[in-house]
Amino acid sequence: MARKATITKDEIVDAAFRITREEGFQQITSRKLATEAGCSTQPIFRIYANMEALKKDVYEKAASYYEEFYASFEKKNEVPFVDLGMAYISFARKEPRLFELLFLMPHEENAKSTYELVNGSCDAVTEQIRKAGESGTKNPDQLFMKIWIFIHGAACMAVSGDYDLDHEQSLAILKSCYKDFAG
């Protein structure tokens, strides 16, 4: 009789996700994962044909985690793109390893684009572009691209430790960017 598997696919993905959050996506190895999951490498390779298949599931878990992070982020600003930017910068500060995985690392062709990740299932970007258009912005899509370059740059600076603005300063700058870019 075959021995019952004592570790599940979800437990393996959760362990790999923890490694990613703490050390980075590139640090996932079968041995390190086995230690984190509390098993040998055998169950990992019984469930996954290779580490790349596992890493796809970790990426999907990170993408879902970002969507949950954005959904729970307090949104209280009337100025379009401000809450979107504040959430993105906050995620970069709080979860730098996950931010690197989702928004800075190259991925396979079937991975989600940055736009798809940020837009999410709630159409966050689409909604903000609509909101900007309703407020009288002549070209809200172009405005989004301009302000997104600033938002992404600020988030990258947060990951590298070069972003020292507090919440209120970040808020003021995002509002100012919107006003300046909207013309």
Model regions: which residues?
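Amphipathic C-terminal alpha-helical segment
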Residues: L101, W148-D166, D180-G183
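Amphipathic alpha-helical packing segments from all-alpha helical-bundle domains
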Residues: E109-S135, D141-M145, A172-G183
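Amphipathic alpha-helical linker/stalk segments
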Residues: K56, E60-D83, D123-K131
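Append "Primarily bacterial transcriptional regulators
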Residues: I28-T35, I44
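Short amphipathic alpha-helical segment with a characteristic S/N-K-E followed by hydrophobic residues
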Residues: I12, Q27, N50-V58
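Basic, helix-initiating cap at the start of DNA-binding domains
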Residues: M1-E23, K32, E36, A53
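Hydrophobic alpha-helical connector segments
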Residues: D57, A71-R97, L143, I147
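Alpha-helical DNA-contacting segments of helix-turn-helix folds
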Residues: T20, A53-A62, F69, L102, ...
